[in-house]
Amino acid sequence: MPPLTWLGTITPQPIGSDQDQLAMRDLHRPCLRLILGDQLNPQHSWFHAVQPDVIYVLMEVRSETDYVLHHAQKVLGLFAAMRDFAQQLKVNGHRVRYISIDHASNRQDVVMNLDALVQHHKVNAVEYQAPDEWRLDQDLRNWVPPSPVTVRMVDSEHFFTERDEAQQLFLGKKQWLMENFYRHQRRRHQILLTPDGKPEGGQWNFDADNRKSWPGQPAEPADTRPCHDHSALWKIIESAGVKTLGESQASAFRWPVNRTEALQQLDHFIERGLPHFGDYQDALSQHSWRLFHSLLSFALNTKMLNPREVVMRAQTAWQEGHVPLHAAEGFIRQILGWREYVRGMYWAHMPRYTTSNQLAHTRPLPHWFWNGQTQMACMASALRQSLTQGYAHHIQRLMVIGNFALLAGLDPQELHRWYLGIYIDAFEWVEAPNTLGMSQWADGGLLATKPYVSSAAYIHRMGDHCKTCHYDVKARTSDDACPFNALYWDFFDRHRSHFQTNPRLGVVYHQLKRMPEQTLQELKSFSVRTLSNLENL
């Protein structure tokens, strides 16, 4: 095999007396350590000391760019961050082998490249950090090297919990309540607790205080993220034939590509965003796509940042009086609670989880999911932002895009692939439970106690899109009626067998029971017309 791209080869350094064991190793048969694109953690114990007989391997491969159609910024951001990480390893004295997307000897598959590297370097061992996606985990577990070598998986040293911790906690339980998991984690890690182990403020959850719409003040914090020119890298990606969606913004790329930049973004959020995050975390605005959100998810999910340091920074900000308790608690709940919880859900139920479709929804996604060309102002705003920025905050994903998709009966598998591709922070372990569980109820209620849907009233209450929308937020069956309204009632009527005994939906079915039959039939007829005309909404 011709040599692959080398980003770093070092001359072995003199070995001190404390490294006698290392000196005994056969330097002609090195250990290969694989670093995946979402494992860019410079604090991992792997990197504590330079080991001349260890070669770190990173690779840009089509098997990773092509399993779904990814956003341009996602591919560009991952490649840029991987290259930055590899270069820093080289600067620190490590041996690095970097396989670029356009190299002639790149076999465009993780395992196939490992085969070639094992033979080329005559390695005696291959180590890899535990993958976060089931697909890669299976590929590496089932890999049979071309020659006898020791293959070892190590921990990624990132999460608060083990893969199976949530499963053990909920053993024998029909439903896994996130709130129970969250309280367990708060106690275990001593977060926002009084000296006697009670929750600070007298309650575990301040979600009721985090539901304000944003009137335009206080002002959104300035966007202080880095600005990179990755035009040259983008040309390489395009020339390699990688297909993407959305805008690359390669000449002014705004996402962090290393830990230093991620820490600067964390500092800025704690100082400027977190004080108002609690009040407006559920707000929608057509005038601002960032509001007070941290924009840390890409850095967290690629492991540039550690969730412990993020949680501790938020707790310290509250302890020092810089942010209100409900802001700190709401943010910590997302990291310590929700993020760890959905990871546990993912590993407990894969691989069947990503094929779930409890409500048997099969309607294709309309074409405007790929261009944002719809007259529904809230959907157009969220979709266009997603295509432009590669990002949408959780309410846009859940209560705008996901809400419409569930009401309209869109295929959850196709929607899952769309979410997995379009967002820069989307990796299957975190995206699939959010999409198939929380958003689409495709898992039959394993994750969510009820479907998260609403009529137009919620979107109107939390945002400002309805003021300028083509559709009438209050109308239900007129020609200009907002599609959310009739679809909402039609959804609960056609899925009575799933939801009418759910105690959390008692009010909904009480209203349906009291609704005149003619009114219900008008709503259902309107829904039929709407669903037959999805492409033109």
Task: For each feature predicted by the language model, list its residue ranges.
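N-terminal beta-strand-loop-alpha-helix module at the start
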Residues: L4-I101
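Short His-Asn-centered micro-motif
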Residues: L34-D38, M59-E60, I99-I101, Y128-P131, ...
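C-terminal catalytic domain of photolyase/cryptochrome flavoproteins
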Residues: L36, Q264, A283, H287-L537
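Gly/Ser/Thr-rich loops at beta-strand to alpha-helix junctions
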Residues: Q39-N41, S105, A130-Q138, L406
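A short acidic (Asp/Glu
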Residues: Q43-F47, V68-H70, Q108-V111, L136-N142, ...
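A eukaryotic "domain-start" boundary segment
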Residues: E64, R188-A299, D480-N485, S497-L537
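A structural signal for the main folded, soluble domain(s) of proteins
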Residues: H94, I101-H103, A116-H120, A125-V126, ...
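Beta-rich, aromatic/charged-enriched effector core domains that present basic-aromatic interfaces
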Residues: D109-W255, L436
